[in-house]
Amino acid sequence: MESEDLSGRELTIDSIMNKVRDIKNKFKNEDLTDELSLNKISADTTDNSGTVNQIMMMANNPEDWLSLLLKLEKNSVPLSDALLNKLIGRYSQAIEALPPDKYGQNESFARIQVRFAELKAIQEPDDARDYFQMARANCKKFAFVHISFAQFELSQGNVKKSKQLLQKAVERGAVPLEMLEIALRNLNLQKKQLLSEEEKKNLSASTVLTAQESFSGSLGHLQNRNNSCDSRGQTTKARFLYGENMPPQDAEIGYRNSLRQTNKTKQSCPFGRVPVNLLNSPDCDVKTDDSVVPCFMKRQTSRSECRDLVVPGSKPSGNDSCELRNLKSVQNSHFKEPLVSDEKSSELIITDSITLKNKTESSLLAKLEETKEYQEPEVPESNQKQWQSKRKSECINQNPAASSNHWQIPELARKVNTEQKHTTFEQPVFSVSKQSPPISTSKWFDPKSICKTPSSNTLDDYMSCFRTPVVKNDFPPACQLSTPYGQPACFQQQQHQILATPLQNLQVLASSSANECISVKGRIYSILKQIGSGGSSKVFQVLNEKKQIYAIKYVNLEEADNQTLDSYRNEIAYLNKLQQHSDKIIRLYDYEITDQYIYMVMECGNIDLNSWLKKKKSIDPWERKSYWKNMLEAVHTIHQHGIVHSDLKPANFLIVDGMLKLIDFGIANQMQPDTTSVVKDSQVGTVNYMPPEAIKDMSSSRENGKSKSKISPKSDVWSLGCILYYMTYGKTPFQQIINQISKLHAIIDPNHEIEFPDIPEKDLQDVLKCCLKRDPKQRISIPELLAHPYVQIQTHPVNQMAKGTTEEMKYVLGQLVGLNSPNSILKAAKTLYEHYSGGESHNSSSSKTFEKKRGKK
């Protein structure tokens, strides 16, 4: 019976393979045309919408995006302001199109995030820090991500912060560890570059030798396997040799690229750029034994076909069918040779992905599910024990796909350093289906065993050590508690509340579970979605037990330093103090603070001002005036209570029901009653919104050899003026200056004139000129701004209109009150309607008309 079933399944698989072959033949003739057209589009740096659309419509994976972005960057030399803005826009588009929860373990995705932050550092270093933090949170396992962030902080003069980043990367187990150790050593030696070119080469060579020795023993059971090889093989080996975790999802993505770049020329390191080669660079291109490291066959120039079916113990034959137990996936991989290759650079390798029909693909998946029990690869018993012990120690299944079905993938341990620290690497022993991405994407997480994270465009693995309980059910009397990002499958089912254990590496999933809840001081809140993130915090939209909407801000304190802790404590204190005095301050309803986390239950807004400005192509003058008045009232409130915000920017204001409210007092400073300014130990704030007096002057204002900067309420006026300037002209006053040193000099230079292009609203232009005066003594104050004609929304005409309307109503009622007959009232009302519809008001003629009507009666 089993033999008959096996034969039936073999016939079914053969028929599916024939369908795949037919589809491939159908698209085969289109390969060259697609390649030429795609090259033509990619070469055009002025408009890449065609390539972008093709990437998003086909695979939409990080490799394709990275290839396109590197090509654009190569063609954007020398880098001008316009090209920089275009590059940043493309990188931003790529990040928005790639969900971090899906690609957080992908090297190309990590490089896109890092490079985007580096480009932002060239344009706006103050904003770049947030993007470096985002890259570090999304892709924490890659050492080069942490080093790039540390390099940026070092370039900003924050040596202590740079060292903290590297040390935390070591604690997190980022790979390769040797790269982090070299960076730390160079930092201690006070070198400007954390990694030099020579160190990169030495690091690459030593890592290769160590990895080869380690893998020779670990992969002994694979020595008899013959594998086909593709152009990505060297990249896969390089990633393998760096000891990086490569989940099956990442592997699957890597072999279905429609754009691919094999080699990349070494480029100079601009502002903050970490001198780390791409792992597929020539420096990392190493020769390894094909019997030890699996690879995939490149498609020959003669277009000979090679099916990625691996038969253990025998060489692959030309026959398209094979034994069912040896089948891993059904696919036709075909790649193209590089168009041009030399020692310095190579062109893009164009590969055409074949897209199956939905019906065929779903049928293929169904048949593969039916035959999964026959496809389980044989794994040595010693390795099986190693996987089991590893999974038990971690308490979390890092590969739910491997447990949900029986396509297990060996997890190989590699020694990282002399302290016996280990990292794991998952390498598929069979090829991965190019035509069937849902196999890995749909089964990478098991929805039944994962408490999903509400997220829209959020961090992948950052908030992994939550301590606050999260309820799995909708407000039960006694319920099991977990973390908002936990995976409940690893916990025992109990009736009591179970808290998450420390130091868990939990995977974040983007979609939200409808019954996921958070507990704050015993109150249960049901999470709807994630609405924001930044640094070590995230914001969720939640429902309380009365079905009222709130926002809960979560702050992870495990990586926070003392300054960060103080900033959050100040924020809570300021919110509690100020929300009682103004409705322009965001409301804080409840909070919970521990050594590991902070939860703040706050008023839920619609969108922050920064995001709103980016989405709006043009701003209505009335909206701008209304929001400006809201900002003035909010800042006036904090100034009345002796608080200078010192870091005002659009992101600090939240739109709530059409009203702007001030949020985020993280770095606010409370002034003493007898002082008019605050001397700060370090420069804070955003450069584009930073007042001249807040910029450090190394030649003056020194105390004990340490530079100081002064801030006052007038400093917030400058920042508000920059925000209003942005709302008026679509940019900040000094945004066009890319070089940060030049920008700082321009801000404090009285000879540098700020442009105020003519606008119809002359009172608005006057407000901008009064706010953006470099001398704080000459700068306008908040009370004066509140009394400025621009803020007075046509007070006098409105009063006159109201007065006129009152007189009109009195006149109409006076005319109607003397009429007794319904017909007379109807005629009088009709006459009044005709008069007012024609734009007329009551006058002598209308009075005579009514008098005549009344006389007739």
UniProtKB/Swiss-Prot annotation:
Ranges for region Disordered: 371-410, 836-857
Ranges annotated as biased composition (Polar residues): 395-407
InterPro entries in alphabetical order: Kinase-like_dom_sf, Mps1_cat, Prot_kinase_dom, Protein_kinase_ATP_BS, Ser/Thr_kinase_AS, TPR-like_helical_dom_sf
Known partners and oligomeric status: Interacts with TPR; the interactions occurs in a microtubule-independent manner. Interacts with MAD1L1 and MAD2L1.
Record-annotated active site: D647 (proton acceptor)
UniProt keyword Nucleotide-binding, yes or no: yes
Descriptive protein name: Dual specificity protein kinase TTK
Family to which this protein belongs: Belongs to the protein kinase superfamily. Ser/Thr protein kinase family.
Phosphothreonine modified-residue sites: T33, T360
A GO term for molecular function: protein tyrosine kinase activity
SMART domains noted in UniProt: S_TKc
Pfam families named among the record's database cross-references: Pkinase
Residues with N-acetylmethionine modification: M1
One of the GO biological process terms: mitotic spindle assembly checkpoint signaling
Reactions catalysed, as given in the entry: L-seryl-[protein] + ATP = O-phospho-L-seryl-[protein] + ADP + H(+); L-threonyl-[protein] + ATP = O-phospho-L-threonyl-[protein] + ADP + H(+); L-tyrosyl-[protein] + ATP = O-phospho-L-tyrosyl-[protein] + ADP + H(+)
CDD domains according to UniProt: PKc_Mps1
Compositionally biased residues, Low complexity: 836-847
Gene name per UniProt: TTK
Phosphoserine sites (modified residues): S7, S37, S80, S281, S317, S321, S363, S393, S436, S455, S821
Keywords for this protein: Acetylation, ATP-binding, Kinase, Nucleotide-binding, Phosphoprotein, Serine/threonine-protein kinase, Transferase, Tyrosine-protein kinase
Enzyme Commission (EC) number: 2.7.12.1
